[in-house]
C-alpha cells in the first residue's frame, strides 16, 4: 500500500477509507489532490463495496476548500486538472461513496461531499460554496448541486456564497443523516453493515445506472464547465483581483470585468 503525507488509506472488509489529514483545515492543495487521486487509482484494483471519505480527528474541518494560492493564473490549470481528476476517477470507479463530515465542508470540500452517494454529518457540520466571494465559481457544484438540493436553492448558495449548517443541509437532502458528534461513527457502521451484505458488482452496476440519469457523463460536463472557467473566467480582471485580495487580506475592488 502506498504511503501519503496528506491522507491515510485503509481497507477493511471490502470498505476503503480515505482520511484527510492535512492539519488544521484540510486545505486541498495540488499535492493533496494528487494523493487522493492516487489512492483512488490504487482502489481501482480492489474489490470494494464502499469508499469512505472522512477527516482526521485532529483536524478542525472536513475540508475548508481548495488552496486559494492555487487559483493564481500560473497554477489554475494544474489545480483544476488535479481536482477534477478526483471526480472523474470516482465516476469511473462506480463504487458507492460515503462522506463523514464533522465541521466545515466548504468550497472544494463541499464539492467532494456533493459527489458522494451518502453523506453523514455531525451537528457541527457546515456546508457552502463561497468561491464567488473570490471572484470565481465552483465548477463541480454548478453541475451537481441543482439535482441534489434543487435548482433555485443551488443557485442561491452558489451565487451568494451562503454557508448553511448541518440541519439545513439535511433538510435540503445534501446530507442523508445528521447525528450528534458522539454517534457519527456508529451511524457510519450502521450504513456499512448494510452495504457489506451486498454484492460488490451489483452495487457497481447500480451506481453506473444511477449516473445514467444525467444527460451527459460528468466527464463531458466537466469539459464544458472547464472551458468557461479557464478560457473565460480566469481571463477576467475580477478573478485575479479576488484571489489577490484574499492573499493580501483586504477587500476586493471589483471592476465587473
Where are these regions (language model features)?
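C-terminal alpha-helix plus adjacent terminal tail
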Residues: 1-13, 45-47, 56-59, 161-167, ...
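A structural preference for short, pocket-lining loop segments at secondary-structure junctions
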Residues: 13-21, 26, 31-74, 89-100, ...
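A short acidic, glycine-rich active-site loop
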Residues: 72-82
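Hydrophobic alpha-helical segments typical of transmembrane helices
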Residues: 82, 86, 140-144, 153, ...
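Crotonase-fold acyl-CoA enzyme core
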Residues: 91-201, 236, 240-244, 250
